[in-house]
Amino acid sequence: KVYHEIGRVKKDFRNFNKPIVIVSGCVAQAETEEMQKREPYIDMVIGPQSYHRIPDLILNYQRKKLFFNETEFDVVNKFDYLQKIPNSQNAISSYLTIQEGCDKFCHFCVVPYTRGPEYSRPLNQIIDEAENMVNNGVREITLLGQNVNAYNFFDNKINYKLSSLIRKLNNIKKLKRIRYTTSHPKDMTDDLIDCYKDCEKLVPFLHLPIQSGSDPILKLMNRKHDKKYYLSIIEKLKKINNGIKFSSDFIIGYPRSEERRVGKECR
C-alpha cells in the first residue's frame, strides 16, 4: 500500500514542480533502505519518534538536498519537546500519549521493531499535561499508547500502573470523561477492571483487540492468550459494569490459516 501510494503521488505531480516527499511512520522506518532503493523520488524517511522535528528536518533538507533518514529512537526527547507545545484553545476532546512501544512481539506487527520497547512517561508529567488541557477547556481526554494498558512507571519505589493514573485523572475537577486505547488482553489486570466500577469519569467502553477466535491461530500470532482468557476478561467487565460496550480487531485469513478455521475465527 505504501509503494502504491508513492506511485500515485508521483503521477499527481508529474506536470508540476516536484515537492519535498516525506514518508513517515512505522512501516517507513522498517523499510527505509528498500524505499531508498526503489523510490529515489522520496526525499526523507522519518520515524514515529521524530515527528516533532519535521519542520527542522525540512529546513535541513532544503539546505543540503540529500536523502535524509531520521529513524532513531529518542522517545524521551520527543516527550520533553511535546509537553512544551500549548494545547488548542478550542478543543473539548484531546489525546494524551502516556506510553510508547511494545514488548509483546505479535508475529504480524512491526511496532516493537520501529517504536522500540515499552516506555511509560513519568506520572507527574502526564498529570501536569492533563491539568493544562483541562484549564484550556478540554473536558474529555483519551489516553494513548501502542500498548496503553502496559503503562508502568516507577517513582520512589512506587509502581504506578494505568489504573493508578486513571484514578488520579478521575480527581481532576473539570475533567468529565476519560478514555484509553489501544489495549492488549494480557495487560487487562483486575485493578484496571475495577476502575470501571470506581471511576465515574471512565467511559464504559473498551477497545480490546483479540485478532482471532481460533486458539491455533492465536498461537501462530504469538498473542500470549487464548479465546477463553479473552472471554473471561469480557465477563469480568460485564459483572463490574453491565452497561459497558466493546469493540475489537480481527485478522481474517492469517497466513497458515486453513479455510475450515475461518468460521471459528469469525465466531
What do these predicted regions represent?
Residues 259-266:
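Conserved small/polar residues in nucleotide/adenosyl-binding loops
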Residues 3-6, 123-124, 157-164, 226, ...:
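Charged helix-capping and loop-helix junction motifs
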Residues 21, 25, 30, 135-255:
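Conserved SAM/AdoMet-binding glycine-rich loop
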Residues 1-151, 202, 206, 228-239:
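Proteins enriched for Cys/Gly/acidic motifs involved in redox and nucleic-acid/cofactor modification
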